């Protein structure tokens, strides 16, 4: 076995964990609105225990009434939810995993509407622009809050958990007491290091008293707040050492407060294990086990971290969403079967914030664990048209249901437009995702025919029972004078290496597609300008991705023309109109790149249904959207065939 260190058992207080693979606490919005765990919650956690994770951590669970950070947060502030937690614990125990539950008061990161009460913090400082201003907790109230943690821990123990994890990170309630940036108190809970640690110490002591040493007590802290005046790694090392002295059994090291959440749930451009050096410094400060987290996606680096003593356990957060069976595959050395998280943030973080159940671009079964893949009542001959992610996803699911599936791809490469999305700086992990879909198709037994354009005549000849049209999208070409000039380079042709750009380049379109194309060119030392209709570039880019994308713009000195409606294309530039109705020209470029997005491509229309009534159109073939929408529709269609 290649990963000996990762499969060694470890003791954490009174708890023995069978290996070093951890599912960290992650909000999923599967819980019921009354704070109880749903059947969906049970299935979600069971699947990750079944997949070999040694320690499963139930998501941030509310310990005080009036402190909910979202409508579907699990709660342990009264006895009514204990039984539902027991169902999760029993399900995980049956699969050999240990279970911890994270205890949280959202503090200033909550909101009064969800909480049903004013939010609270060490000091009345809002966490971000537009957020509620928290009420400063009185000295007497601090002591009452301490009791709430102890009672919640006792309820968790009654539900059968093996451990609790006290949330002290990310700008939530306890975190606001630790940092001098957010703690301006003048009582015994503010000022000196000892005073700022007092709340945490009292919580640990209360939790240990209420649980009588029968379960392990952990805490999650930041390695660094990543904001001026906040905690840095040296502060956090001292905090970790202090918490060990309070009787803590293990430290879980995360990173950053929410206003720098590009460090909390790092996007695609961030390397796996990007906080490793900070965790290592904290590990040197303590003798208790240390859990590291931060975009770990493969077991190789995790093995190195544990083997070299830089940490003791590794938490695979979003990776456990993408592939709940990752540890089992690592143990069996089925490394190519692993499904990689590409840190797109489309289905997990975006839905978590919106209060919707999370989903996953690379794992369409997330949230549907109880359903699995039901065998088809009758095997069908299924034709899938298009080898992008929608087609690949639909093909392997349909094949695993027992259908006879043939996938047709018109080009010599699979992956569709997602293959090109891997070309801009820092996006290479997308290739890994496409490869994983190909492997799933191959191992399921899907027949793949490359360089095969599908026509209505071919469909008539093959006589399929069902057809899934996943023909994708093509470059959006608006009715603008000169746009059809052969000198204009389509962004997809540029990324695919079919056409080359000159030194000075104008990229027309400043959405995600255009901005990433501009960064691709900037990295190669082109002189790049982006022109965009909206008032800002990258307006459609997820925040955490945009932070890094705009850093590329700064590093590569990419220029911007915004609020500009392109009216005419020239070989060397464009004419555009601004909001005041004035016309301007931007010319003198060696190349003009068209990157205004994509439009759906479905060459069959309704004619195909006259041949095969059981026809479905999915993904960009319906309307150009996110890859998440494509795989979601692929799952919905293929699972019902």
Language model segments and positions:
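Flavin-dependent oxidoreductase catalytic cores
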Residues: 1-385, 389, 393-400, 404-405, ...
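Short, contiguous acidic/charged loop-to-helix segments that flank catalytic cores in large enzymes
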Residues: 265-271, 373-379, 420-432, 491-497, ...
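Beta1-alpha1 glycine-rich phosphate/pyrophosphate-binding loop at the start
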Residues: 384-451, 476, 510-548, 559, ...
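A Rossmann-like FAD-binding core segment of flavoenzymes
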Residues: 431-476, 483-503, 523-607
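Short FAD-binding loop at a beta-strand-to-alpha-helix junction that anchors the flavin cofactor
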Residues: 608-641
């Amino acid at each position: 076995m290649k990963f000996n260190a990762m499969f060694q058992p470890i003791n954490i207080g009174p708890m023995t964990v069978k290996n070093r693979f951890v599912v960290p606490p992650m909000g999923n919005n599967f819980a019921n609105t009354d704070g109880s765990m749903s059947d969906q919650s049970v299935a979600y956690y069971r699947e990750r225990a079944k997949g070999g994770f040694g320690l499963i951590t139930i998501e941030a669970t509310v310990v005080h009434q009036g402190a909910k950070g979202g409508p579907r947060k699990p709660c342990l502030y009264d006895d009514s939810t204990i039984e539902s937690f027991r169902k999760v614990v029993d399900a995980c125990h049956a699969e050999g995993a240990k279970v911890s539950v994270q205890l949280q008061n959202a503090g200033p990161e909550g909101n009064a509407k969800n909480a049903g009460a004013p939010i609270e913090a060490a000091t009345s400082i809002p966490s971000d622009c537009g957020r509620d201003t928290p009420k400063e907790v009185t000295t007497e109230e601090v002591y009452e809050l301490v009791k709430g943690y102890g009672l919640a821990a006792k309820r968790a123990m009654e539900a059968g958990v093996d451990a609790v994890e006290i949330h002290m990170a990310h700008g939530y309630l306890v975190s606001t007491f630790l940092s001098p940036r957010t703690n301006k108190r003048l009582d015994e809970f503010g000022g000196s290091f000892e005073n700022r640690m007092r709340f945490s110490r009292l919580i640990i002591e209360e939790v240990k008293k209420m649980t009588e040493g029968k379960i392990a007590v952990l805490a999650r802290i930041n390695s660094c707040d990543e904001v001026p005046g906040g905690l840095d790694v040296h502060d956090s090392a001292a905090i970790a050492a202090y918490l060990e002295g309070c009787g803590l059994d293990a430290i879980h090291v995360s990173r950053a407060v929410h206003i720098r959440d590009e460090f909390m749930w790092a996007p695609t451009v961030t390397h796996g294990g990007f906080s490793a050096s900070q965790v290592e410094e904290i590990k040197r400060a303590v003798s208790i086990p240390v859990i590291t987290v931060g975009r770990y996606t493969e077991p190789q680096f995790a093995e190195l971290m544990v083997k070299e003593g830089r940490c003791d356990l590794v938490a695979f957060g979003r990776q456990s969403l993408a592939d709940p069976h990752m540890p089992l595959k690592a143990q069996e050395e089925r490394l190519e079967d692993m499904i990689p998280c590409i840190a797109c943030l489309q289905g997990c973080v975006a839905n978590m914030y919106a209060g919707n159940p999370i989903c996953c671009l690379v794992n369409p079964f997330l949230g549907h664990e109880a359903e699995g893949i039901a065998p088809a009542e009758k095997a069908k001959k299924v034709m899938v048209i298009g080898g992008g992610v929608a087609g690949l996803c639909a093909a392997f699911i349909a094949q695993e249901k027992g259908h006879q599936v043939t996938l047709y791809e018109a080009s010599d490469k699979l992956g569709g437009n997602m293959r090109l999305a891997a070309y801009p700086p820092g996006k290479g992990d997308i290739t890994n995702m496409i490869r994983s879909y190909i492997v799933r198709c191959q191992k399921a037994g899907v027949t793949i025919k490359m360089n095969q354009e599908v026509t209505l005549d071919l469909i008539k000849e093959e006589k399929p029972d069902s057809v899934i049209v996943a023909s994708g999208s093509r470059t959006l070409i608006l009715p603008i004078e000169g746009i059809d000039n052969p000198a204009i380079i389509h962004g997809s042709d540029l990324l695919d290496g079919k056409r080359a750009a000159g030194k000075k380049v104008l990229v027309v379109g400043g959405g995600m597609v255009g901005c990433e194309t501009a960064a691709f060119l900037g990295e190669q030392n082109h002189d790049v300008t982006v022109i965009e209709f909206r008032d800002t570039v990258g307006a459609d880019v997820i925040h955490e991705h945009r932070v890094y994308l705009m850093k590329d713009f700064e590093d590569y000195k990419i220029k911007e023309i915004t609020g500009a409606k392109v009216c005419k294309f020239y070989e060397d530039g464009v004419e555009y109109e601004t909001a005041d109705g004035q016309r301007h020209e931007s010319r003198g470029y060696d190349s003009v790149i068209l990157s205004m997005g994509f439009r759906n491509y479905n060459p069959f229309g309704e004619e195909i249904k006259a041949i095969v009534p059981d026809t479905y159109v999915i993904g960009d073939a319906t309307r150009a959207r996110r890859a998440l929408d494509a795989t979601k529709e692929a799952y919905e269609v293929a699972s019902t065939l």
